[in-house]
């Protein structure tokens, strides 16, 4: 699996791995790259079956497989220890990495994540699946911003959204791969295993997230033994895109604090 690695800003700089959500594209993290690369070696990637890592995914594709293939790619790149920043599905992959490779994951940042899929989130995806079956990729892509962004943010950026739609259609991961990745997301359940995650965790959520209620992050915080929760009042599901200034400050402070906390505990 292809990874994109930034040059380390100094010798032995900590590594931060960015894992996007269901869309799978590493470019999702563009608003974070410049600030992160000043302090960390940053790893981005298109998830298997998407972008520049094309593949046909098995029907039983799982979050555990997503975690394993990423860890193997990191080891092949010479990376043994890394912090993880995961958004939604990416946060699930991050938790799986922390469970399966505890000696490798130094810190976990969960952005609008959850223990197991909430009934409201499941309802949103049911609607989106019906759109995919009835209207194809175009209907899926055109509806997607409604679940990602606040209404006023979208209204002020109509040309940008049209350009994003065209790009998303041109690089659509395919109906079968999308549904298999979505099914993996829906099957994931960390409610009985989260207390085994021992690395320090920062939980970031947006109170106006339409897709994933912020209560999901509260449940996550209660279940994780070494976690802290930060709430953004505005930004929607893709709060790192809509309000990068606020998000980046939380992310940078969280990474620095948790990495220091971990080193002090060793």
UniProtKB/Swiss-Prot annotation:
Catalytic activity: carbamate + 2 H(+) = NH4(+) + CO2
Family indicated by similarity: Belongs to the AB hydrolase superfamily. Hydrolase RutD family.
A Gene Ontology BP annotation from the UniProt entry: nitrogen utilization
Designated gene of the protein: rutD
Protein task: Involved in pyrimidine catabolism. May facilitate the hydrolysis of carbamate, a reaction that can also occur spontaneously.
UniProt cross-references to InterPro entries, sorted A to Z: AB_hydrolase_1 (IPR000073), AB_hydrolase_fold (IPR029058), AB_hydrolase_sf (IPR050266), Pyrimidine_utilisation_RutD (IPR019913)
Molecular function via GO: hydrolase activity, acting on carbon-nitrogen (but not peptide) bonds, in linear amides
Keywords: Hydrolase
Enzyme class, first EC level, given as a word: hydrolase
EC number: 3.5.1.-
Pfam family, one: Abhydrolase_1
NCBIfam families in the record: RutD
Organism: Escherichia coli (strain 55989 / EAEC)
UniProt protein name: Putative carbamate hydrolase RutD
The keyword Hydrolase belongs to this UniProt entry's keyword annotation: yes
All copies of domain AB hydrolase-1, residue ranges: 14-115
Gene3D superfamilies: alpha/beta hydrolase (3.40.50.1820)
């Amino acid at each position: 699996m292809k990874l994109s690695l930034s040059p380390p800003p100094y010798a032995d700089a900590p590594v931060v791995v960015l894992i996007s959500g269901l869309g799978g594209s590493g470019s999702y993290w563009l608003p974070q790259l410049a600030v992160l690369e000043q302090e960390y070696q940053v790893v981005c990637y298109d998830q298997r079956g998407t972008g520049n890592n094309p593949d046909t995914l098995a029907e039983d594709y799982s979050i555990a497989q997503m975690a394993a293939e990423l860890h193997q790619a990191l080891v092949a790149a010479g990376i043994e220890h890394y912090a993880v920043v995961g958004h939604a599905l990416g946060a699930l992959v991050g938790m799986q990495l922390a469970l399966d490779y505890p000696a490798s994951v130094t810190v976990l940042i969960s952005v609008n994540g959850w223990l197991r899929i909430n009934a409201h989130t499941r309802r949103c995806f049911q609607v989106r699946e019906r759109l995919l079956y009835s209207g194809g990729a175009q209907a899926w892509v055109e509806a997607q911003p409604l679940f990602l962004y606040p209404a006023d943010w979208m209204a002020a950026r109509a040309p940008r959204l049209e350009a994003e739609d065209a790009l998303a259609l041109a690089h659509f991961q395919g109906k079968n791969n999308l549904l298999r990745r979505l099914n993996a997301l829906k099957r994931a359940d960390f409610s009985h295993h989260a207390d085994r995650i021992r690395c320090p965790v920062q939980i970031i959520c947006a109170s106006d997230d339409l897709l994933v209620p912020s209560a999901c992050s509260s449940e996550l915080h209660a279940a994780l033994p070494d976690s802290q929760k930060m709430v953004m009042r505005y930004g929607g599901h893709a709060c790192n895109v809509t309000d990068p200034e606020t998000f980046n400050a939380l992310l940078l402070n969280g990474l620095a604090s948790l990495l220091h906390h971990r080193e002090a505990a060793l």
